[in-house]
Regions:
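Terminal, regulation- and interaction-focused segments at domain boundaries
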Residues: 1-30, 112-113
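Ser/Thr-rich, low-complexity intrinsically disordered terminal regions
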Residues: 16-17, 21-67
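Long, solvent-exposed, polar/charged low-complexity segments
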Residues: 12, 38, 54, 104, ...
Length: 113
């Protein structure tokens, strides 16, 4: 998956873009780690149980803070999944929305109208 100006999680009707006020230290405060290439990476389990079989939410922000990519993947991170298809994933959607709303509130991303 390539870095993009605006993106959405597979199946989500909401698109996000980078905020002009985004700062590197804000991403680090939210739990992003720096890769060897200088990009910022976020990788969290959406399932709040101790189980390692739940889907993962991943965001990678380019080092220039202009483009990014995000996805919900299988536990091993190899395949994107759509948590918006089935009603049984309501808790996962709620956890995803909570994380993204916190990032929007901290001026990392903006919702595209």
């Amino acid at each position: 998956m390539a870095f993009e100006q605006t993106t959405a999680v597979l199946g989500s009707p909401v698109q996000y873009k980078m905020s002009p006020q985004a700062k590197r230290y804000t991403f680090k405060d939210l739990g992003f780690t720096e890769t060897k290439q200088g990009n910022l990476q976020f990788d969290r389990a959406l399932d709040m149980t101790v189980s390692k079989t739940g889907p993962r939410f991943k965001i990678t922000v380019a080092k220039d803070l202009a483009t990014f990519k995000m996805s919900v993947t299988t536990p091993n991170g190899l395949k994107q999944i759509n948590i918006f298809e089935k009603e049984e994933h309501a808790e996962l959607r709620q956890n995803l929305e909570y994380m993204l709303n916190e990032m929007v509130n901290r001026d990392c991303f903006e919702v595209v109208e």
